[in-house]
Amino acid sequence: LISDNTKCIKCMRCIQICDKVQSLSVWDVVNTGSRTTVNVSGNRPIEKADCAICGQCITHCPVGALRERDDTDKVFAALNNPDVITVVQVAPSVRAAWGEQLGMTNEQATEKRLAATLKHMGFDYVFDTNFSADLTIMEEGTEFVEKLKRRNLNKFPMFTSCCPGWVRFVKSQYPEFVDHLSTAKSPQQMFGAVTKSYFAKKADIDPARICSISIMPCVSKKEEAALPQMADAGYGQDVDIVITTRELVRMIRAESVYPMALDEVEFDSPLGEYSGAGV
């Protein structure tokens, strides 16, 4: 999350959404007179402000004074490196929103056209995060059943751990419920681990060559992918780069890609297949 006070117009939308809707009160008015601006409340660094990194302040800022960290250069570098195999996963909500900034209708901005666009941009493998969403619900379902068998030793209800913003929120605001969270990874992180293990073996690819890229709707996914415990495959982080829907649109525009001119294609197999039950 990047803050640029030189762009701030003191509209207070970030303060209102964080305080009234998210109930976190991360942002506040600081200084007086002509020096008045918006900053982290209590003059704290953002790391100590119990921010959930939900991104609501970013989406409500009308002037770009708050924005996500731009990682598009990292993706372009991976795409232009002939020694790197780029594997991208697309979240379900991204498929529903990517066409808005490109002036496309829902009928035009189909998931198959998104897959075609990513292929046209040079991604080697284009997969659907719905695949690992299926893995997540199976893991969470199994965990829940096992807890029920020993209900006297476990705490209920069991909460999902799919969203890193939600997990951060619980840890900072309701620490007494942390033990209620599922131990299952999010679909993004499951997918990253599977990409550099099962898929790499199945496709006969050296996992060290894989750059696992994730297109997600939430900036908290960037923070999640960088956590030291999210490196189970043994080849660096399970997910190397995370970009948001807005970053994806900027990349499409930078490459002068016109999605409507592309024929629709399917997501790659086998990690592009899913039941839909995990959404």
Where are these regions (language model features)?
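Non-heme iron-sulfur electron-transfer modules
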Residues: 1, 21-50, 64-86
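Local cysteine-cluster metal-coordination motifs and their immediate loop/turn environment
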Residues: 6-21, 49-64, 133, 161-165, ...
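Short loop/turn motifs at secondary-structure junctions
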Residues: 14, 21-23, 57, 62, ...
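Immediate flanking context of iron-sulfur cluster ligation sites
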Residues: 1-6, 43-52, 205-215
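Helix-enriched interaction subdomains in cytosolic or periplasmic regions
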Residues: 45-67, 171-175, 184
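Iron-sulfur-associated redox domains of electron-transfer enzymes in respiratory
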Residues: 68-279
